[in-house]
């Protein structure tokens, strides 16, 4: 309503004057509203005080703000620095691509066997090893490998908050069962996500949401065919991998790394996160690998591997590496190129790096009247695209299509206005009339520009 918009404008106006974008100010306003509604034991007065400095209320205890205000980078400034890095990071996060790119460190990556993708509405098993194909190249070969190994893991091809991994265990002749993947459950619990949200391992609760879709292929055990039917219901990409052999209680080591000027690698911060009962526990790790007075096993090898990976992908300026300790050493569980800050106070080295980066960005990002006018026109154009473009196409493709239409409308002088509108309505650019010889009778036999964009 009008009153809520007035409140929002009153809140974001001071932040706009400080040079933050409207998009960032609105995002911070949403976080502040959620923070005010959360009952975390912090008084409303302290919350408002922290918000005025650019921090959320959990940072008061985290950074001891009462005694050290302004020492650590604020939450709003960290949001201002995001997104980190550039287009070089597109491949990071995909397990299959990481397995191919980081070939010199494959012994510390998850061991993958098959990549499961969807083609023509069917799940297809492709070999990770496309050269020797020693584990096979189809679903039958996966079953053969499963019978040989006894158990394998089916996991999302990238870390997900909604999708989880399962252990597929052979329990008899042509009999397989889904089991809990300890590593995935620990990972998702640490980040506050629900494991087995599809309830494939447990009974459905009584308070299921109305829009919840029950999996029709759920069973207590599966044969070869029913297992394939179950896997076919999984959305997006999955991989078949070797289960982690976790040593003791699962924990997640996270190391913050930075590459300066494509040549110097710095490890900035280290911490360990695990579960203490149902509570998430986070502890700092020293640069020498000491945790609660004891040195972490394989620490020197961990540092060597992380430094080697960071140097190999030196185009990526700032990222974190998540590591799980196993019986045989360790495995690099994931790489995050847009990480959040640690849940505990971060190190001085990481803080100095972020503050220096913040100062450089403020020097280079200058909001001029021309930039403001360009942003205003882009916003108006996006609104026009949403209203005029047909649904069923991704927003960035809508923008490409409408940009093509606008360019054709302005520069193609060989067609009349009515011909242009006729073409646009049917998904063609107007110059196709002469190129294809378009008529009302034959235009459906050609692939339209709109369909090509889609």
Q: Where are each of the predicted segments found?
A:
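Alpha-helix-centered segments that form part of catalytic cores
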Residues: 71, 76-78, 86, 216-239, ...
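Phosphate-binding site of ATP-dependent enzymes
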Residues: 147-152, 157-158, 163-285
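Short, surface-exposed charged micro-motifs
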Residues: 254-256, 320-324
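Conserved N-proximal alpha/beta basic substrate-recognition cap immediately N-terminal to
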Residues: 3-147, 159-160, 384, 388-454
């Amino acid at each position: 309503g009008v009153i809520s918009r007035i409140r929002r404008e009153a809140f974001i106006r001071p932040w706009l004057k400080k040079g933050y974008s409207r998009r960032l100010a609105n995002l911070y306003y949403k976080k502040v509203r959620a923070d005010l509604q959360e009952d975390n034991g912090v008084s409303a007065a302290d919350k408002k005080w922290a918000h005025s400095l650019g921090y959320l209320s959990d940072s008061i205890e985290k950074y001891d703000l009462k005694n050290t205000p302004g020492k650590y980078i604020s939450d709003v400034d960290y949001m201002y620095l995001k997104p980190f890095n550039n287009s070089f990071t597109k491949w990071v996060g995909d397990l299959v691509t990481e397995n191919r790119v980081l070939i010199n460190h494959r012994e510390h990556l998850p061991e993958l066997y098959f990549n499961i993708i969807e083609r023509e509405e069917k799940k297809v098993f492709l070999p990770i090893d496309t050269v020797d194909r020693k584990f096979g190249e189809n679903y039958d070969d996966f079953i053969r490998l499963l019978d040989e190994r006894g158990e394998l893991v089916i996991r999302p091809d990238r870390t997900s908050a909604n999708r989880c991994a399962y252990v597929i265990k052979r329990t008899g002749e042509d009999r397989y069962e889904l089991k809990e993947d300890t590593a995935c459950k620990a990972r998702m619990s640490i980040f506050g996500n629900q494991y087995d949200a599809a309830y494939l391992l447990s009974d459905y609760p009584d308070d299921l949401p109305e829009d919840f879709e029950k999996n029709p292929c759920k069973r207590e055990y599966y044969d070869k065919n029913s297992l394939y039917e179950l896997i076919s219901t999984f959305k997006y990409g999955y991989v078949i991998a070797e289960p982690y052999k976790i040593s003791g209680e699962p924990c997640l080591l996270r190391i913050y790394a930075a590459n300066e000027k494509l040549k110097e690698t710095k490890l900035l911060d280290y911490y360990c996160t695990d579960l203490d009962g149902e509570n998430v526990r986070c502890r700092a790790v020293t640069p020498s690998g000491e945790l609660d007075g004891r040195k972490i096993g394989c620490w020197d090898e961990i540092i060597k591997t992380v430094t080697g990976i960071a140097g190999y992908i030196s185009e990526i300026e700032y990222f974190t590496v998540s590591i799980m300790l196993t019986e045989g050493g360790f495995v690099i569980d994931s790489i995050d190129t847009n990480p959040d800050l640690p849940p505990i106070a971060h190190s001085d080295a990481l803080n100095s790096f972020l503050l220096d980066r913040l100062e450089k960005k403020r020097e280079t990002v200058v909001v001029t009247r021309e930039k403001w006018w360009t942003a205003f026109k882009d916003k108006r154009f996006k609104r026009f695209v949403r209203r005029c473009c047909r649904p069923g196409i991704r927003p960035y493709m809508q923008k490409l299509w409408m940009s093509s239409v606008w360019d054709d409308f302005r520069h193609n002088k060989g067609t009349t206005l009515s011909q242009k509108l006729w073409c646009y309505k049917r998904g063609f650019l107007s110059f196709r009339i002469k190129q294809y010889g378009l008529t009302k009778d034959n235009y459906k036999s050609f692939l339209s520009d709109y369909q090509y964009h889609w």
